[in-house]
């Protein structure tokens, strides 16, 4: 049996009315299997049959089915807010609270987190080198003064005395000059390195007042000496043969600039941040992935097409919109549909004042006015044909009723 060439495969499948991902999978599989032309024809016929069967029926209520298919498993989800997702010290919101965050398109999730994949093209790359990975983690994690020093308030001298820990500074690869420079930039006060005591910095407020000193004592704890503002903690974890970084806090744009970060595999659970940095298509994929992972973690399986429909709706206008009165539901064309969701009186009054006309195209508005909904059999118009010729019964033929009367 002679297998067909790649060119023949391409010519046989190029005009098939199938999605591109199915065509790609079909092409790769048949080339790998080395099928004959007859087998290829049978495979195409079978694939077309399966695809036709899997397509949704005309007039099906896809939106209602998707809502039910996601909502029903949602009732079985736990209310756990925090969970150590296999990583020490990194808390992540899961379960129902996380699903609500996703469909509400929250600007900032309650527990922002990043998964930073590292480059692994060569054996000496970051993904395989623990020392390089650890050094990168210190570059990304925000270093505050609390991490490397003890701060003492000297009320008699009206000064702040900072005693730096040499070992902590070595671990985070930060110098005393860097600390001094950062405080000078951020606080605009007199910062000096103690000439008598090693690793000691003295900060004097602009005005020698008790209030200024206390204010300064608060301010120095907010200065980021090194790393990215907002990344509170970075944890290194070995998965298989390679190292991965997990962060508490998210800063996708800044993290992608670092050498050693794999930009194609690094992600965050902040969907709005993905939209701002990578665009709307990436945000759509993030919604699908986050919702699917959240449901799967709870042991629930939902057909991905239901989630894809929700993600498509949330991103169809080129920006991420919530499913709520400030998003999808609040922007429906139908006045009745908007009124049925929330703030009913306001919607009806506003529509009456502006003279809006409702075309009654959707499900909700037709139910409100008592009409059949335009779904399923309600969206099909039947026309009965009249008989072309009406057969008349001759008067001489007696009916059964007349015969019974005569016999009686």
From Swiss-Prot:
Its EC number is 2.7.7.6. SUPFAM superfamilies: beta and beta-prime subunits of DNA dependent RNA-polymerase. It catalyses: RNA(n) + a ribonucleoside 5'-triphosphate = RNA(n+1) + diphosphate. The keyword Cytoplasm applies. GO terms for molecular function: DNA binding; DNA-directed RNA polymerase activity. One of its GO terms (cellular component) is DNA-directed RNA polymerase complex. Its main location: cytoplasm. Keywords: Cytoplasm, DNA-binding, DNA-directed RNA polymerase, Nucleotidyltransferase, Transcription, Transferase. Part of the RNA polymerase complex. DNA-dependent RNA polymerase (RNAP) catalyzes the transcription of DNA into RNA using the four ribonucleoside triphosphates as substrates. Forms part of the jaw domain. Belongs to the RNA polymerase beta' chain family. This is DNA-directed RNA polymerase subunit Rpo1C. The gene is rpo1C.
